Amino acid sequence: MICAPFVGVNHHWKNVLFGCAFLLDKITVSFTWLFETFLESMRNQKPNAVFTDQCQAMKNAIRVVFPDICHRLCLWHISKNAAENLPRHYGIPKFKSRFNKILFNCETESEFESSWDALLRDYNLVGNKWLSTLYENRERWCLVFSQQFLYKNESFIKE
């Protein structure tokens, strides 16, 4: 059973639980039902952005129910998924440090690109399927590719 909390941030930068549901499976139909039900409970007021893990079924449902909102990937989930998808490498402190620098601290696109390329090259990960998919979705999680969104919605800048 999957627990699906809906958490927001109030004007004091505190987490607020809007609702929670339990799903039997992780399929697009279930997530579509969940998001439509949530939207109805919020009087059809859509969120400005949605932060999720890398679940493809959830991504598909967001496209259907919230086609115009900003869908971002949660950095905490990416870090957790890295530990699961790259267990041999993520256990190496220097690799973990470099990977987390890419996730949280790159300030320019060129710094991101050079750091990413060096990490893949240095640890022989060129062609790794999980990292390739993560790179293809970099606009959804890498802050240097999200600046336009962040400046439009300053409420998402504060940590």
Q: Model features per residue range: what roles?
A:
Residues 1-2, 47:
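Conserved catalytic motifs of the protein kinase core domain
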Residues 2-14, 23:
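Short conserved beta-strand segments at catalytic cores or DNA/RNA-binding microdomains
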Residues 9-14, 38-46, 65-70:
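Secondary-structure transition/capping motifs at alpha-helix termini
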Residues 19-20, 153:
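Generic secondary-structure boundary/loop-capping signal
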Residues 20-42:
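Active-site beta-loop-alpha junctions of metal-dependent nucleic acid enzymes
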